[in-house]
């Protein structure tokens, strides 16, 4: 079943907790405020944006950053589509820095950093990498890897070392 958030009542609330390593998607209608909260610190929420009426209209990270002369996303910034329309704006931000350039983790990155894991061994404690999680959610809307776009990583600050490598 597709989750849809509608701006029907200013007092209505929908709350869901998303465990680390899991994935979820929702259709957010115009006029809805979506609040993300890092309950324990150290969270990262990877998020992609599409026009629900015309799925070929997608989030455009380069234009989002370029037109606002910024590298980070924070309060006051807007997220733009590849058609030049605003998908959403950041109206409040207590973290102060969210990035949209580093993408998401692939299976080989996760395995290299944390070791190989699979459902057969870990059962319900198994966690999927970001790339494969996005593919699962895209499939729910009839999309595949060709529809993968840049994502925003909420609660993730990125800086550069002396050699220009992003860390």
Where are these regions (language model features)?
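Acidic, Ser/Thr/Pro
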Residues: 1-167
């Amino acid at each position: 079943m597709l989750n849809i958030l509608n701006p029907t009542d200013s007092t209505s609330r929908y709350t869901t907790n998303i465990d680390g390593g899991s994935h979820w998607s929702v259709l957010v209608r115009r006029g809805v405020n979506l609040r993300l909260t890092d309950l324990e610190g150290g969270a990262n929420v990877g998020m992609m944006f599409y026009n629900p009426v015309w799925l070929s209209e997608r989030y455009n990270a380069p234009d989002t950053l370029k037109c606002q002369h910024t590298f980070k996303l924070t309060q006051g910034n807007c997220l733009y589509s590849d058609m030049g329309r605003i998908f959403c704006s950041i109206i409040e931000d207590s973290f102060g820095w969210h990035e949209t350039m580093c993408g998401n983790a692939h299976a080989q990155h996760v395995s290299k950093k944390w070791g190989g894991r699979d459902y057969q061994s870990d059962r319900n404690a198994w966690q999927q990498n970001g790339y494969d999680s996005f593919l699962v959610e895209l499939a729910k809307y009839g999309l595949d890897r060709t529809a993968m776009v840049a994502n925003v990583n909420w609660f993730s600050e990125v800086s550069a070392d002396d050699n220009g490598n992003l860390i």
